[in-house]
């Protein structure tokens, strides 16, 4: 049986957004204008996050991810009378609550007809590890439907399952109750950020509640959690799983500069004969250059991991369940995906 690892980026969620129609309600590229309710006041969340609100109103025509980038720019924030520590922290709180709402919508609209779920179902028993750069819980929702246990080093868990590493944070992560104790509320009265503590995973009914310390990296921000106790050991566990991986899927990875060190480390941890699957409608040229010299396949169908007839692209023989045979040309790529005989 082949071993499959998953590396998931924003394209995974965008795929589901198009499939389900969620993108017409909540465009994940424009979260600041979502109608996110404030857990403390019941009014609009942005109204309770004054520095972020001021930053956005000063840049109403900029793409939202560029606004978040400005939240990290101390010189710019100072030039308009803002404290960049507060703008970054309020950005984390906003993104955590906003994408909690988004995750609940994903769960409501989830369908087993979605092509990526069909692919995951076909390969359920081969999946040995997963790494996600997304805050949302779409991958977790799919794994829950498959009854495939996962573990992210959270304290409130029995400690078994495949590794699910979320180094940029997750909307259901929260610091342990006994690590830093106070009653969170919006507007913020306590400014708590970047403390390396243990974590718990929140239940779904707890997602739309104020956080003591939001755990999410702001878009365009280098990972500040890389050495944290819930990230570094999880990365080591994941990298150990990669050593025996036959296929590694990079699903919807943007390969932005801020993410490259983490993505490059994954690529460098893979066996030389591991087949890399780049599932992306527009594969980043820099990423293709990074994996050149290795066996790789590109899946760029906008409808997901399916062929022109809608059949799921398989990484095993559908009749026997055995691994696919490699092409005779010694490319290292399975025969049915190798272009040498087309």
What residue spans do the PLM features occupy?
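Short Cys/His-rich zinc-binding micro-motifs
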Residues: 321-336
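A Trp-anchored, charged/polar loop motif used as the substrate-binding/catalytic surface
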Residues: 110-114, 149, 223-240
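Gly/serine-rich nucleotide phosphate-binding loop at the start of the catalytic core
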Residues: 1-128, 136
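Short secondary-structure boundary/capping segments
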Residues: 19-29, 144-149, 265-266, 342
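A short acidic (Asp/Glu
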Residues: 15-20, 139-144, 176-179, 259-264, ...
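SIR2/sirtuin-family catalytic core signature
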Residues: 1-16, 232-321
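Cys/His-rich metal-chelating microdomains
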Residues: 170, 332-335, 341-342
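Extended, H/D-rich, highly charged conserved domains that either
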Residues: 40-83, 121-222
């Amino acid at each position: 049986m082949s071993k499959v690892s998953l590396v998931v980026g924003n394209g995974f969620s965008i795929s589901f957004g198009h499939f389900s129609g969620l993108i017409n309600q909540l465009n994940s590229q424009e979260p600041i204008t979502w109608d996110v309710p404030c857990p403390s006041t019941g009014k609009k969340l942005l109204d309770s996050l004054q520095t972020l609100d001021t930053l956005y109103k000063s840049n109403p025509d900029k793409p939202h991810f560029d606004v978040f980038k400005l939240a990290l720019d101390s010189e710019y924030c100072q030039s308009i009378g803002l404290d960049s520590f507060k703008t970054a922290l309020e950005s984390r709180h906003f993104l955590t609550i906003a994408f909690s709402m988004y995750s609940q919508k994903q769960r409501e609209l989830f369908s087993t007809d979605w092509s990526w779920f069909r692919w995951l179902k076909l390969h359920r028993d081969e999946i040995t590890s997963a790494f996600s750069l997304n805050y949302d819980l779409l991958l977790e929702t799919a794994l829950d439907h498959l009854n495939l246990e996962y573990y992210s080093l959270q304290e409130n868990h029995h400690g078994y399952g495949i590794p699910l590493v979320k180094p940029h944070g997750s909307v259901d992560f929260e610091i342990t109750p006994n690590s830093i104790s106070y009653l969170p509320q919006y507007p913020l009265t306590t400014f708590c950020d970047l403390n390396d503590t243990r974590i718990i995973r929140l239940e779904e009914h707890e997602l739309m509640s104020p956080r003591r310390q939001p755990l999410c990296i702001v878009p365009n921000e280098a990972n500040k959690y890389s050495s944290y106790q819930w990230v570094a050991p999880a990365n080591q566990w994941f990298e150990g799983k990669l050593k025996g991986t036959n296929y590694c899927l990079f699903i919807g990875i943007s390969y932005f500069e801020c993410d490259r060190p983490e993505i490059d480390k994954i690529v460098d941890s893979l066996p030389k004969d591991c087949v890399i699957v780049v599932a992306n409608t527009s594969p980043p040229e820099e990423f293709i250059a990074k994996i050149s010299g290795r066996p790789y396949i590109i899946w760029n169908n906008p409808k997901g991991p399916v062929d022109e007839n809608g059949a799921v692209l398989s990484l095993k023989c559908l009749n026997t369940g055995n691994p696919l045979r490699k092409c005779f040309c010694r490319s290292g790529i399975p025969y049915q995906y190798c272009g040498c005989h087309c």
